[in-house]
Amino acid sequence: MSNKCDVIVVGGGISGMAAAKLLHDCGLSVVVLEARDRVGGRTYTIRNKNVKYVDLGGSYVGPTQNRILRLAKELGLETYKVNEVERLIHFVKGKSYAFRGPFPPVWNPITYLDYNNLWRTMDEMGQEIPSDAPWKAPLAEEWDYMTMKELLDKICWTNSTKQIATLFVNLCVTAETHEVSALWFLWYVKQCGGTTRIISTTNGGQERKFIGGSGQVSERIKDILGDRVKLERPVIHIDQTGENVVVKTLNHEIYEAKYVISAIPPVLGMKIHHSPPLPILRNQLITRVPLGSVIKCMVYYKEPFWRKKDFCGTMVIEGEEAPIAYTLDDTKPDGSCAAIMGFILAHKARKLVRLTKEERLRKLCELYAKVLNSQEALQPVHYEEKNWCEEQYSGGCYTAYFPPGILTQYGRVLRQPVGKIFFAGTETASHWSGYMEGAVEAGERAAREILHAIGKIPEDEIWQPEPESVDVPARPITNTFLERHLPSVPGLLKLLGLTTILSATALGFLAHKKGLFVRF
């Protein structure tokens, strides 16, 4: 069986589908080859009577994520705000503390200085890193050879700050601090708008969700493309030795095109044979960028009882014994299907896969009962979870991470074409990489690279800025005068030391002038 078209897209996630739609809209014939029995990739919306619909994969959108908002609106989708009306909870050392705002408050003055310096330093270091080429940062190699654990050991003076910083890394990239490059993580946070934007619900990356689920983005593009989207077609071979590119699938089908877009996580490239072989750096890159580990858990209740206690459902939970590190309210906008969404992250995900689904649910409910101080948390009516570690056509979630030393050596080839193969996927984005926004940016950029290759657009139109969403405008992230100018703990100690020396000198001079020194 032979199928000819202009472009073959490997991977039917949001990035691949966005690429296919743009090319289709420009009049090119496209075939999408998807390994799974569904489109959506790392977005996955299920429907049943208990949940109506629920996103078990990528779900959240917010201000400055203008491409996914534009595409979704074009497809007829609407957003709703994640509930953050009531108070948030910070659970640490067995106690719950209510707060408002993106970060838990700190009352110890020394810890506060340390805490403030942590976020300020990460944002300042991020400003030194180019979003489109992090390997060009002035101190790229120094930062890349350092793990985030090593960087946090340098920045943080108090255990409290180090622990919340570790949770921040776990939550942002579903990996441990000793696993990721400092350069890569600082870049990752920077290209998401900084520490406050990436972690926030209101005015941040988790502000909104799509009514009906994020899986509809890919599903509605599939409806547009029709039978040009082929499911259960894992690609096993790409041959560029002839005039056209020949692609073979696991079920022995042959497809032929002028160009190919690879819209899969880099590591899944190892499942595909290439003729001729991939260039050396590309061949090694795909063996060196694993995906994070996460289990997404949705616990359903009769009603959102936490709201009656003036809690919004957001919980920041510290402690090795706690299976969940972070939660959000996942109740439907009409108040139905009351639920708490929680992430089991990084090493905890790898540890808790040994338990049964029922055992994980019990641990979650016991934790929520303790954090919320409510026995109602022990009475779930339904439970859904998705262990992304077991997905052979994802390899994990949310995104691929770069261990120390990899970004500066191999980063340049991440989206560098190989012959007639162009690369998409959220990992190749320069803005909100790791999110649906990054997936759309990458897919449309790869599509425009092909449009340029065939002479339809000039080179300077490959990368295009996106107008701000009218429906979801962004408010600027601002810091107070104190947040900008408070010293770090070492800075305070130096200041106190200098003050002590100056005071002692002044007192000595005064005593000398008054003749108070005794001469022997």
UniProtKB/Swiss-Prot annotation:
Residues at the site labelled Important for catalytic activity: 156, 365, 382
Mode of membrane association = Single-pass type IV membrane protein
* Location in the cell: Mitochondrion outer membrane
Q: What is its main location?
A: mitochondrion
Q: Which Gene3D superfamilies match?
A: 3.90.660.10, 6.10.250.130, FAD/NAD(P)-binding domain (3.50.50.60), Guanine Nucleotide Dissociation Inhibitor, domain 1 (1.10.405.10)
Its EC number(s): 1.4.3.21, 1.4.3.4
The alphabetized list of GO BP terms reads: negative regulation of serotonin secretion; phenylethylamine catabolic process; positive regulation of dopamine metabolic process; response to aluminum ion; response to corticosterone; response to ethanol; response to lipopolysaccharide; response to selenium ion
Q: Does the keyword Transferase apply?
A: no
Q: Which residues lie on this side of the membrane: Cytoplasmic?
A: 2-489
What does the function comment of this entry state? Catalyzes the oxidative deamination of primary and some secondary amines such as neurotransmitters, and exogenous amines including the tertiary amine, neurotoxin 1-methyl-4-phenyl-1,2,3,6-tetrahydropyridine (MPTP), with concomitant reduction of oxygen to hydrogen peroxide and participates in the metabolism of neuroactive and vasoactive amines in the central nervous system and peripheral tissues. Preferentially degrades benzylamine and phenylethylamine.
Q: Which named protein is this?
A: Amine oxidase [flavin-containing] B
Q: What gene is behind this protein?
A: Maob
